[in-house]
Amino acid sequence: MATKSDPNYKIIAENRRARFDYFIESDLEVGIVLTGSEVKSLRTGQSNIAESYASVENGELWLINAYIAAYKQAGVFGHEERRRRKLLVSRKELARLWQAIGREGMTLVPLVMYFNDRGKVKLKIGVAKGKKVADKRETAAKRDWNRQKQRLLKQG
């Protein structure tokens, strides 16, 4: 998993809203099929996965609506910025994901996109259930209380 302190991973894009908007039940590291200009654009850090989601269609896993900026030096050989990108996952994992999202209210949300220690682009997706407004308020209240506790412990 890509963490901010781990030197072997370089985080490209992070979906910060995912943990606020969804209950994440489980997560999975998957590969992603990219073109050369997309990889070069990712190396410059020009991407956004905040509005994207993953979907299982025709026995394949797809990343939909992820933004990877056009690479300027690619010229006419560039790529479409919001094209559908195939995600690489084993059949066993795909069956597990298909079963998980078959339940009511479940979806696949991209959490983090990063380069692993071998320089390959990986995507961490989570099986998630949407939060209601009251749940979001509760999460915010817990976070505020934890910050307040830390301040109090630091002071005294």
Curated annotation (Swiss-Prot):
The protein's UniProt keywords, in alphabetical order, are: Cytoplasm, RNA-binding
Q: Name one GO cellular component term.
A: cytosol
Q: Does the keyword Protein transport apply?
A: no
GO terms for biological process, alphabetical = trans-translation
Q: Name one GO molecular function term.
A: RNA binding
Matches recorded under InterPro entries: SmpB, SsrA-bd_prot
Which parts pass through the membrane?
Answer: none
Q: Where in the cell is it found?
A: Cytoplasm
Family in the record: Belongs to the SmpB family.
Q: What does this protein do?
A: Required for rescue of stalled ribosomes mediated by trans-translation. Binds to transfer-messenger RNA (tmRNA), required for stable association of tmRNA with ribosomes. tmRNA and SmpB together mimic tRNA shape, replacing the anticodon stem-loop with SmpB. tmRNA is encoded by the ssrA gene; the 2 termini fold to resemble tRNA(Ala) and it encodes a 'tag peptide', a short internal open reading frame. During trans-translation Ala-aminoacylated tmRNA acts like a tRNA, entering the A-site of stalled ribosomes, displacing the stalled mRNA.
Q: List, alphabetically, the NCBIfam families matched.
A: PRK05422.1 (NF003843), smpB (TIGR00086)
What is the name of the protein in this document? Answer: SsrA-binding protein
This chain's source organism reads Paracoccus denitrificans (strain Pd 1222)
Taxonomy, top ranks, is: Bacteria, Pseudomonadati, Pseudomonadota, Alphaproteobacteria, Rhodobacterales
